[in-house]
């Protein structure tokens, strides 16, 4: 059985950008799947062009990490389960290392949100930098937990699918799309 967690149209309808929404998703999964989960795909996120810097941080990083950690015991019940998160190939160098370090080493959402609240949310380069930072931090988190999780029968990996036509990319401005298409990625846009 596939269970879809979404803001509006899921089997579990919650806001993964909020701590309450994440906990509700975890609680509902524990109720719906008491015998465990075979796997999970963490794919919720917003682009750097969304205009809400806090949302980028809360959804793209904390949403994934909190839900994955929250269902870890369910994943362990099904020895051989798998978690796939979505990172990004551009996340290796264009983000803010200070934000990446705060996300990975401190993990204090309120502190990071306080820091980004003083940034210019109307500046696309600021939003894109935070987007890249969350994806890089997510890849680092996956790398950090992967050995421990694997020892307990749970594989976890971050994939970088490249450009994909999704609801997120459909709302990007023409300038943002041109910048994205200028990246030297040897592929066409993928389909959702």
Regions picked out by a protein language model, each given a short descriptive name:
Residues 160-171, 175, 180-182:
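Short, flexible catalytic-loop segment of classical short-chain dehydrogenase/reductase
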Residues 184-192:
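A conserved structural motif in NAD(P)-dependent oxidoreductases
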Residues 5-21, 29:
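Rossmann-fold cofactor-recognition segment
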Residues 11, 56-57:
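A hydrophobic alpha-helix adjacent to the NAD(P)-binding/active-site core of NAD(P)-dependent oxidoreductases
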């Amino acid at each position: 059985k596939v269970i879809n967690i979404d803001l509006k149209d899921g089997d579990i309808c919650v806001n993964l950008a909020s701590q309450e929404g994440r906990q509700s998703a975890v609680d509902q999964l524990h109720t719906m799947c008491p015998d465990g989960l075979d796997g999970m795909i963490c794919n919720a996120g917003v682009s750097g062009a969304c205009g809400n810097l806090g949302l980028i941080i809360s959804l793209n990083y904390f949403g994934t990490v909190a839900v994955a950690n929250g269902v870890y015991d369910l994943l362990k019940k099904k020895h051989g389960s798998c978690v796939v998160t979505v990172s990004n190939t551009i996340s290796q160098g264009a983000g803010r290392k200070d934000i990446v370090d705060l996300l990975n080493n401190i993990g204090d959402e309120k502190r990071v949100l306080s820091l980004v609240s003083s940034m210019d949310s109307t500046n696309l380069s600021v939003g894109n930098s935070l987007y890249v930072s969350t994806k890089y931090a997510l890849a680092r988190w996956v790398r950090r937990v992967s050995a421990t999780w694997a020892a307990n029968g749970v594989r976890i990996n971050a994939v970088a699918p490249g450009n994909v036509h999704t609801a997120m990319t459909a709302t990007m401005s023409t300038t943002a799309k041109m910048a994205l298409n200028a990246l030297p990625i040897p592929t066409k846009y993928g389909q959702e």
